[in-house]
From Swiss-Prot:
Annotated protein name in UniProt: Steroid hormone receptor ERR1
Region of interest called Disordered, as start-end residue ranges on this chain: 1-67
Cross-link Glycyl lysine isopeptide (Lys-Gly) (interchain with G-Cter in SUMO2) placement: 189, 402
Stated family: Belongs to the nuclear hormone receptor family. NR3 subfamily.
Residue ranges of domain NR LBD in the record: 192-420
PROSITE patterns, per database record: NR_LBD, NUCLEAR_REC_DBD_1, NUCLEAR_REC_DBD_2
PTM section of the record: Phosphorylation on Ser-19 enhances sumoylation on Lys-14 increasing repression of transcriptional activity.
Functional summary from the UniProt entry: Binds to an ERR-alpha response element (ERRE) containing a single consensus half-site, 5'-TNAAGGTCA-3'. Can bind to the medium-chain acyl coenzyme A dehydrogenase (MCAD) response element NRRE-1 and may act as an important regulator of MCAD promoter. May function as a modulator of the estrogen signaling pathway in the uterus. Induces the expression of PERM1 in the skeletal muscle.
Protein source organism: Canis lupus familiaris (Dog)
Modification Phosphoserine occurs at: 19, 22
Major site of localization recorded for this protein: nucleus
Biased composition (Gly residues): 58-67
Highest classification ranks of the organism: Eukaryota, Metazoa, Chordata, Craniata, Vertebrata
InterPro entries: Est_rcpt/est-rel_rcp, NHR-like_dom_sf, Nucl_hrmn_rcpt_lig-bd, Nuclear_hormone_rcpt_NR3, Nuclear_hrmn_rcpt, Oest-rel_rcp, Znf_hrmn_rcpt, Znf_NHR/GATA
Annotated DNA-binding residue span(s): 76-151
Length: 422
């Protein structure tokens, strides 16, 4: 794998915050030009009944269930707030200049709005100025990030902010004091969870929605395009999540890039497996995209359904808990085998801290006894080779899709694919 990917700049990793819909993982400011939209045919989003208006304002799907994902031959995206043509990715979301400016004014002015109706006003290109309260709510719902707006109004600088203000920074390296936290799932006693685990639980990304088009054309290409769009957004979220892990941001930029380029698919695949744990022989690629093995094959994924379900069943047999999942996910990140890492000692230090946190959690879960926590931790760690093998098969499949050239892919997803297969 090459240590450099054409087109990936420090902005992908260093700029904050990230959003599910931004291929850069960064917020735009008034001193930065809009991010160039991916060339070629790209998935666009619209609402049923959407009409283009001469005012530059329309309808967008930000909410679950209301949006439709359709393929278009037009090389452009729509604003997720109002449906107008998006000028770029602003504050983490594909949006038009008008909604970008509205969101910025609202945050900088600390403006509070009140809906004159029932807080359910339709936000379209023509009606977006009718209710500012519902428009602002829509901005937040589709993922616009308040932290991306500079409050000081000073041009040329970058505001300092915390991604999650409720989370105190954790020391790294250092001790992570234990504290009680109720463990979900079963009438088991409370397990002590150290501060690192608590931090990982808090910074765990919110749910993503694929927004597939139920009325779309038959065939597997639209489904594969939906997954490519979903993966592109998940990469952005993964970059933001990785930066929230104590010790990762202290790595050099090149090492951050090398680590992420080598394990991003493992993180995504583990997320699919975790969402699928409550299901029976089904895969939850997103909250609104669940496929069984036959459905995955019909969607153009070949035998990936069976491959992914093998991993899911392994984790189901372990009765993987959420605390264990967030630790395993962080360990998968730190378990990078990239030969381009410059400071291997720093990455090893991160890996050791996460391993110790896993042992501490399992010790509290098992209670006093003869090494049960180490056996449990060992069984969890033994899933990492299967995870890597599974991710490799998923990568190979989508790289083949890329070579066929029939499915539109966004720039970041393409670059990360090429970095892995180079």
């Amino acid at each position: 794998m090459s240590s450099q990917v054409v087109g990936i700049e420090p902005l992908y990793i260093k700029a904050e915050p990230a959003s599910p819909d931004s291929p850069k993982g960064s917020s735009e400011t008034e001193t930065e030009p809009p991010v160039a939209l991916a060339p070629g045919p790209a998935p666009t989003r619209c609402l049923p009944g959407h009409k283009e208006e001469e005012d530059g304002e329309g309808a967008g799907p930000g909410e679950q269930g209301g949006g439709k994902l359709v393929l278009s031959s037009l090389p452009k995206r729509l604003c997720l707030v109002c449906g107008d043509v998006a000028s770029g990715y602003h504050y983490g979301v594909a949006s038009c200049e008008a909604c970008k400016a509205f969101f910025k004014r609202t945050i900088q002015g600390s403006i509070e709005y009140s809906c004159p109706a029932s807080n359910e006003c339709e936000i379209t290109k023509r009606r977006r100025k009718a209710c500012q309260a519902c428009r602002f709510t829509k901005c937040l719902r589709v993922g616009m990030l308040k932290e991306g707006v500079r409050l000081d109004r000073v041009r040329g600088g970058r505001q300092k902010y915390k991604r999650r203000p409720e989370v105190d920074p954790l020391p790294f390296p250092g001790s992570f004091p234990a504290g009680p936290l109720a463990v979900a799932g079963g009438p088991r006693k409370t397990a002590p969870v150290n501060a690192l685990v608590s931090h990982l639980l808090v910074v765990e990304p919110e749910k993503l929605y694929a927004m597939p088009d139920p009325a779309g054309p038959d065939g597997h290409l639209p489904a594969v395009a939906t997954l490519c769009d979903l993966f592109d957004r998940e990469i952005v979220v993964t970059i933001s999540w990785a930066k929230s892990i104590p010790g990762f941001s202290s790595l050099s930029l090149s090492d951050q890039m090398s680590v992420l380029q080598s394990v991003w698919m493992e993180v995504l695949v583990l997320g699919v497996a975790q969402r699928s744990l409550p299901l029976q022989d089904e895969l939850a690629f997103a909250e609104d995209l669940v496929l069984d093995e036959e459905g995955a094959r019909a969607a153009g994924l070949g035998e990936l359904g069976a491959v992914l379900l093998q991993l899911v069943r392994r984790l189901q047999a372990l009765r993987l808990e959420r605390e264990e999942y967030v630790l395993l996910k962080a360990l998968a990140l730190a378990n990078s085998d990239s030969v381009h890492i410059e400071d291997a000692e720093a990455v090893e230090q991160l890996r050791e801290a996460l391993h110790e946190a896993l042992l501490e959690y399992e010790a509290g879960r098992a209670g006093p006894g003869g090494g049960a926590e180490r056996r449990r931790a060992g069984r969890l760690l033994l899933t990492l080779p299967l995870l890597r093998q599974t991710a490799g098969k998923v990568l190979a499949h989508f790289y083949g899709v890329k070579l066929e050239g029939k499915v539109p892919m966004h720039k970041l997803f393409l670059e990360m694919l090429e970095a892995m297969m180079d």
